[in-house]
């Protein structure tokens, strides 16, 4: 078991560790002074945050529905939610462009509304929401399932409405799961490349910039940008661990 554990850790840490230590401090400082890099990282963070906000608004009620209800076809619905995790991400980009094109009824509606998907921030946010939503829903659903339903039932038996019960019982007990879901959604969105490059090469987010610099200039110019993105993702996951740690003592 110890050997397997070491092997797993080595597989994960060796490539990433080598990438992190290879660029010099000078290279990293130079990258952080590069306006194009800063713009792409800022755009990535903004789009990931918007995707997480959308996931919070539309994903929370859906996660609660899945956590608290049994209905015919529930397993099918849960499988549909997981589809963005399973399919190759270039397919996601192609699928989104398909429904957003003028040949599709939805695309014509968007065109009349003046909403552009291809080559726009809106398109990037749509893609990031698509890939990040399953992580938010699954995380929050598990959090709601961990809350004893009897607490909600007692509140309702005492005359509390559904909304009041959710705000006073479910939300205070489930906020950690919701915050963890937001972080998971953002982390996943920050790493997305395959679907974004098809829908919106420009404006350029960080993963697309890394790809462009690698294809144009090689490892030397792409690695420092990649290291910055790795460190941002690492910070998010450290936050996630701190958020989840007290949860073991709850309920």
Predicted regions and their residues:
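Short coil/turn motifs that cap or connect alpha-helices
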Residues: 72, 160-162
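The alpha-helix within a helix-turn-helix
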Residues: 155
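Extracytoplasmic catalytic/substrate-binding loops of multi-pass membrane glycan-assembly enzymes
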Residues: 204-205
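Membrane-helix/interface signature in polytopic inner-membrane proteins
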Residues: 141-152, 162
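Glycine/proline-centered hinge or cleavage motifs at structural transition points of membrane proteins
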Residues: 158-159, 172
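Membrane-water interface segments at the C-terminal ends of transmembrane alpha-helices
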Residues: 1-26, 35-145, 169, 173-189, ...
């Amino acid at each position: 078991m110890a050997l397997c554990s070491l092997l797993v850790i080595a597989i994960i840490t060796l490539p990433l560790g080598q990438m992190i230590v290879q660029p010099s401090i000078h290279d990293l400082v130079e990258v952080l002074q590069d306006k194009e890099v800063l713009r792409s990282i800022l755009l990535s963070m903004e789009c990931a945050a918007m995707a997480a906000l959308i996931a919070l608004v539309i994903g929370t009620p859906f996660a609660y529905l899945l956590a608290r209800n049994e209905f015919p076809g529930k397993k099918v619905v849960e499988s549909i939610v997981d589809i963005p995790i399973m399919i190759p991400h270039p397919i996601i980009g192609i699928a989104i462009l398909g429904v957003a094109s003028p040949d599709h009824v939805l695309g014509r509606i968007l065109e009349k509304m003046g909403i552009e998907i291809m080559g726009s921030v809106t398109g990037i946010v749509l893609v990031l929401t698509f890939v990040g939503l399953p992580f938010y829903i699954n995380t929050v659903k598990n959090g709601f399932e961990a809350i004893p339903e009897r607490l909600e039932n007692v509140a309702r038996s005492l005359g509390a409405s559904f909304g009041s019960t959710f705000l006073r019982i479910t939300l205070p007990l489930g906020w950690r799961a919701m915050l963890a879901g937001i972080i998971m959604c953002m982390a996943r969105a920050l790493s997305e490349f395959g679907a974004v490059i098809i829908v919106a090469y420009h404006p350029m987010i960080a993963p697309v910039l890394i790809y462009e610099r690698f294809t144009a200039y090689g490892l030397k110019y792409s690695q420092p940008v990649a290291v910055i993105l790795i460190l941002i993702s690492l910070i998010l996951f450290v936050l996630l661990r701190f958020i989840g740690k007290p949860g073991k003592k709850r309920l």
